[in-house]
Each structure stands twice: as C-alpha cells, then as structure tokens.
Amino acid sequence: MSSSLGKEKDSKEKDPKAPSAKEREKEAKASGGFGKESKEKEPKTKGKDAKDGKKDSSAAQPGVAFSVDNTIKRPNPAPGTRKKSSNAEVIKELNKCREENSMRLDLSKRSIHILPSSIKELTQLTELYLYSNKLQSLPAEVGCLVNLMTLALSENSLTSLPDSLDNLKKLRMLDLRHNKLREIPSVVYRLDSLTTLYLRFNRITTVEKDIKNLSKLSMLSIRENKIKQLPAEIGELCNLITLDVAHNQLEHLPKEIGNCTQITNLDLQHNELLDLPDTIGNLSSLSRLGLRYNRLSAIPRSLAKCSALEELNLENNNISTLPESLLSSLVKLNSLTLARNCFQLYPVGGPSQFSTIYSLNMEHNRINKIPFGIFSRAKVLSKLNMKDNQLTSLPLDFGTWTSMVELNLATNQLTKIPEDVSGLVSLEVLILSNNLLKKLPHGLGNLRKLRELDLEENKLESLPNEIAYLKDLQKLVLTNNQLTTLPRGIGHLTNLTHLGLGENLLTHLPEEIGTLENLEELYLNDNPNLHSLPFELALCSKLSIMSIENCPLSHLPPQIVAGGPSFIIQFLKMQGPYRAMV
C-alpha cells in the first residue's frame, strides 16, 4: 500500500464568464476552431542561426542524442492562451503593421487558414512569423515581401510553396518544420541567399541535385523525414556548419561529404548507415558527430584526422572494435559513447586514449574486465558508465580514480567492492544495483560527497556503520537485499529525501530514523518480518510517500494498518511520546 501523505486536493474554480454554447459555436465558426497543441515547442522568433542545445534526449549529454535545431524553440503558451483570430482581426493586424511601418510581424497561433492577399502591401517587412496556424498554402503575394530575411512557417499543413517566393532575394532563414511537404519545393532551391533552412518533420523522400544552389547555407536540418540518400552535390555546400539528417533512412553517405570542411556538427543518428566514407576524415572542423542507432560494423581509420572532434556517439551499432590509436589521435575528445555495441574488450590504444575524456559510456556490451592502468592518464574522467556488462571484479588501481564523480557499475557480476573505494573522494553518484554484493567496504564512509547510492538487488545482509559519514546523501536505495537491521548511524543522514528498503528481511527500524528531517519518500514494502514501526517515524515531518505493502505490522491496530500509510503516521503521532512535538 503506497500513499501520498498530507496532500490537499486542488479546488476547481468555475469561470464566472464562461461563454454559452451558442456563443462558443459562433466564435468557433468565426475562428475556424482550434487545432491540437503541437508537441514540439515553438522556435524563438529570431532569425539567428541555431546552435545545438546541450543536454536532449537525445543532447549533447554524453551518451545522449543531440538535436541541432532545438535551441530555437520557445515554450508553448499556458493552456487557454492560444489566440483565436477571425479574418478581420488578421487584416487589422496587417493594417496596423503597415501604418506603423513595422519590420517584424508575428501572426503565430492565430488559427489562420488563409493569409490575406493584402500581405503584399507590407514590403518593408524583414521578419514574418506564422508558426502554428492552419495554412495549407501561401498566397503568391508573399513574393512581394522583397525585404524579407526571416520567414517562419513551422507547424502548419503546407504541401507546397508558391514560385513567387523566388523574389525573396534577401531571405536568409526559412523554417518549414512540421508541415506536410512530400518534397523540397523547387522554389526553395532558388533561394540562393539562404543561410538557414529547417525542414524537420515533413514527408520528404529526396534531396535534389539543385541543393548545390544553396551555397551560402550554414545550417541545414532535414531530420525526421524519409530520405534514403543524399546527392553528391551536397558536397558543394562548402559553408555548411551544421548538417542534421537524423531520423531518416540513409544507408550510405556520398564521399563528397568530405568537401564540407567547415562542418562542426554532423548528426546522423537513427538512420540505416552501413558504413562511412573515408572522406569523413577531411572534416577538420568537426566537433560533434552523432552516429547512434545505425548499422555500422566498423569506423574508418581516417576519422583519426578529425582532430577537432569533442563528442563522438556510436551507441547502438554493431561495432566490436575501433581502429588502433583512433582515440589517441582525437586530442580534444571529451565525450565518448560506445554503449549497446559488441565490445568484448576495451579499445586498443592504452591509457593515452582516455587522457582528455570527461565522459565514457560503455553500457550494454560484453566487457568482462577493466584493464589495470587504463585510466592512469584519465585525469579529467568524471563519468563512467559500465552498466550491463560482464564484470566480475574491479582493477587493482580502482582507488586511483580520484576525479570520478558519477560511476555506474549496475547489472554486472561483482561480488565485492575494493576497500580502496575510499580513494574516490570526488564521487557523488554510485550505482551498484543488480550485482552479487554481500557486504560493503568500510572505506565507503570516506565518500563524503556522495549524493546518491543505489544498491538495489544485491545480497547485502548488513550495512557498515561508516555509512553514517555520508551526510550529503540524498538518495539511498537498498531494495531487494537480505537486510535484517539498519545501523543506528543511519540517523545521521539528515539530507536523505529518498530511502528504499523494500523487499528485505527487516524486523524493525531504528528509532534514529526520526532524525531524517528531510525524508520525503520511504519504501518499506515486502518486508515479511516487519511487525512494528517506531513512534519516532512521526518526526519525519516532510514524509509524503510511504509504501508498506505486504508488511504484517501486527503490533499496530488492524484498522489502522487497513487505513494505509496516512492512518499509520497519524496513529504514531497521536499515540507516541512525541505527540506534543508534531
């Protein structure tokens, strides 16, 4: 039985000015009704070139995919704030813009079906934003806006563009994301002043050879389409800095990609790539390369020439080895993700290959050993993820990993943690769940910066008293072990907010648990020998979630136990010696 404690239900206030059904119907007819809110946030209404936002899903967190155009999004409005517009209101906005000689017009989120032809009069405009409307086409008159530099049409239902747009000789940014284009409109290839082109999330299947005409492009995003190949002419985009072709159906890249030597960000994740051309080594400016979720079985040696590379993500391919000395050649590499591949050993190349690495993710491979000394030069290595491998032990120099901040060793076959874990003095997160640990080293108490310790699903029978020294600990997970008691020193963990003790053999909780003044979540479920709870538990004033399923608690009145956690806490408050304090 799990419960949220002390939560009050939000009262629902009625809108005193709610429109009648007839009024709503009349308004709906005038505005054309509302469309569903798009799940993608709106881009900012600025015509600046977009840069990759760090730390997507996908990214630039190490081991996480990155999206090169996600920094131009702006938050969705609060519910109920979407604007309704009749055609008359839109015309009114156009007139106001003309009278004030405004250079910027934002008609986003107006449920516009058809843009009035009078738009042609606003020849002074340099920026026009039409995000999140219901446009299926644009009037030819938009071609009269000869000073336009930014045209934002994201989140509409466009299937084509008028040929008159080729009059927009000054257009630099064109945003066509989230429309219904089945091809790149031919007029787009004639907009040779474009520097930024967003075509994400359409239904495009091909990129024509005419892409070569857009020689000024620095940003091209065509992710989330159905593109099966890129033309050789892509290599003529010599000013390209960011190329995002993620989430398509590419099996190969043209060798001409090597001519795009200015590229810094290349996102190819979630395709069907079987190989990479050797010419990729010509991308001397490349700093971020995303190749996760493809079908690669090898990486070309030429990649070693990409000496500016800082982030390399190869997650979920079929790679079992890397070219020797590849990593040592990438002297600026700080984030390396090799998760979900076929590695049985660490890459060949010795300690020097990790000298600049900050984050290393090798989760879900078949590695059974971390070589001794492999991190002896890894002075900045802060995050290591070895989850879901076949480790049975840790190297003898384990205690020298003094820069480590986050260490994930979950889902291996470790039977013990070396005593010299005490040397990992920078450690803040330690994940050891799903191993074969029967006890913990006393040196664990030296990890004074530890905020999270996860020991779920091991074979622990007790905890060392030194755990009391982990005073910064906020999350302690001990679920599914064989604990019968807790050390009294657990009461010193006053910063603890989450304590997982479910699926153990606990017979009681120490009264010191009452000193956990910041405890918010307590999981006691499935402890078949837990018959009572200490009155001191009532002193945990911030406790909001407590789980007691499948605990007998026979020393408490049955009707109290049946009432659930909130009843139990109330009982402990009122019946215990601390009722005057709570």
From Swiss-Prot:
InterPro entries registered for this protein in UniProt: Leu-rich_rpt (IPR001611), Leu-rich_rpt_typical-subtyp (IPR003591), LRR_dom_sf (IPR032675), LRR_domain-containing (IPR050216), LRR_R13L4/SHOC2-like (IPR055414)
GO MF term (any one): volume-sensitive anion channel activity
Keyword match Electron transport: no
Subunit structure: Component of the SHOC2-MRAS-PP1c (SMP) complex consisting of SHOC2, GTP-bound M-Ras/MRAS and the catalytic subunit of protein phosphatase 1 (either PPP1CA, PPP1CB or PPP1CC). SHOC2 and PP1c preferably bind M-Ras/MRAS, but they also bind K-Ras/KRAS, N-Ras/NRAS and H-Ras/HRAS; these interactions are GTP-dependent and both SHOC2 and PP1c are required to form a stable complex. Interacts with PP1c in the absence of Ras GTPases. Interacts with M-Ras/MRAS and RAF1. Interacts with ERBIN; disrupts the interaction with RAF1 and Ras, preventing the activation of the Ras signaling pathway.
Localization (cell): Cytoplasm; Nucleus
Function description: Core component of the SHOC2-MRAS-PP1c (SMP) holophosphatase complex that regulates activation of the MAPK pathway. Acts as a scaffolding protein in the SMP complex. The SMP complex specifically dephosphorylates the inhibitory phosphorylation at 'Ser-259' of RAF1 kinase, 'Ser-365' of BRAF kinase and 'Ser-214' of ARAF kinase, stimulating their kinase activities. The SMP complex enhances the dephosphorylation activity and substrate specificity of PP1c.
Pfam families on file: LRR_14 (PF23598), LRR_8 (PF13855)
GO cellular component: cytoplasm; cytosol; nucleoplasm; nucleus; protein phosphatase type 1 complex
Per-repeat ranges for LRR: 101-122, 124-145, 147-169, 170-191, 193-214, 216-237, 239-260, 262-283, 285-307, 308-329, 332-353, 356-377, 380-400, 403-424, 426-448, 449-470, 472-494, 495-516, 518-540, 542-563
Entry-linked PROSITE patterns: LRR
Gene behind the chain: SHOC2
Keyword set, alphabetical order: Cytoplasm, Leucine-rich repeat, Nucleus, Repeat
Motif RVxF motif location, chain numbering: 63-66
Gene3D superfamilies: Ribonuclease Inhibitor
SMART domains on file: LRR_BAC, LRR_SD22, LRR_TYP
Region (Disordered): 1-88
Transmembrane domains' residue ranges: none
Basic and acidic residues bias (residue ranges): 1-29, 36-57
Family: Belongs to the SHOC2 family.
Gene Ontology biological process: cyclic-GMP-AMP transmembrane import across plasma membrane; intracellular signal transduction; positive regulation of Ras protein signal transduction; regulation of MAPK cascade
Predominant subcellular localization, coarse grouping: cytoplasm
Protein's name according to its UniProt entry: Leucine-rich repeat protein SHOC-2
Recorded domain comment: Contains a N-terminal RVxF motif that is important for interaction with PP1c. PP1c (all isoforms) binds to the concave side of SHOC2, via LRR 2-5, 8-11, and 13-18. M-Ras/MRAS binds to the concave side of SHOC2, via LRR 1-10, 12 and 14-16.
The UniProt record lists the keyword Repeat: yes
